[in-house]
Amino acid sequence: MRESMKSGNFVISLDFEIYWGVRDVLELDQYRDNLLGVRSVIPGLLHLFDKYDINATFATVGLLFFNDKDEMMAGLPEIKPKYTDSHISPYEGHFDQVGRDETEDVFHYAPSLIKMIQQSGQEIGCQTFSHYYCLESGQTIEDFREDLRAAKRIAEKRGITLKSFVFPRNQYNEAYLNVCKEEGISSFRGNETSWLYKAKDADSETLFRRASRLMDAYMNISGHHCHEVTDQDNPGLCNIPASRFLRPYSNRLFFLEKLRLKRITSSMTYAATHGLTYHLWWHPHNFGVNIKENLAFLEKILLHYQKLSKKYVFRSVSMQQLAESLKNEK
């Protein structure tokens, strides 16, 4: 029976950005502990992924690749986005806060961590060059193309070909998909298929939507979000929609941990038994405090994956691996 079942897939993607991903919403001192914790989180994740034979995609902001400030400034795109809200652009004064190199500034550089991920055999994907916001007013599709090309250039300099793409802040913009494909991207992470997760610009987010998503993390409000992954909408570019954001451990909500785990594992089981794909995602900095508790919670998820993989045709694949397997099936 096991051999006759359609294969299900377990996908993990991580939005690797450190301070570039939150610089427009949080002061450095507000989030310092989480960001510093990334230096311990990455080795912890890689250890668990190796232990449970997990393939993951680290969608990395291009600015993290640089070895020093001189290389970074030389690698900036010539054409930069002109957001209506200049505060969200890193090009409007933020580089004055960037230190000389990774030794001096662990918040804006991560070449040693990228090398660690690369050597572990995990996929390094793309989360744009500058944590680019694809739905904000003022920026254009050509700005986006130049940003993506800048990310490709620095990745290629490190021997990495970017094939998988994540929209920063989940600002999914369908109009930009052809640019991704033209620049060599073969898969992207779409948003969950519910009004709760519909892509919006920052000003359109509401407290009700955020509260509803929080409730959905503990109770099945919006469904399992398991998908049959195809490239039918855009041949050659595979949409691998998100299923669940892995929220970090909360000291205030610790009594709901069993519900949070069940919300995830029940959907994983649904994917395994129906030959569908379950896509879990989060940021390494989400695990940056309460590291022990967060990694222990993740290990429970991976143990459940291990059980499912033995009972059903359920495999762990990176975004690139899933896109390649679909291509080979044609």
Q: Residue ranges of each PLM-predicted region?
A:
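Active-site clefts of carbohydrate-active enzymes
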Residues: 237-253, 283-285
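Catalytic alpha-helical scaffold of carbohydrate-active enzymes acting on polysaccharides/glycoconjugates
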Residues: 1-164, 169-240, 257-279, 287-330
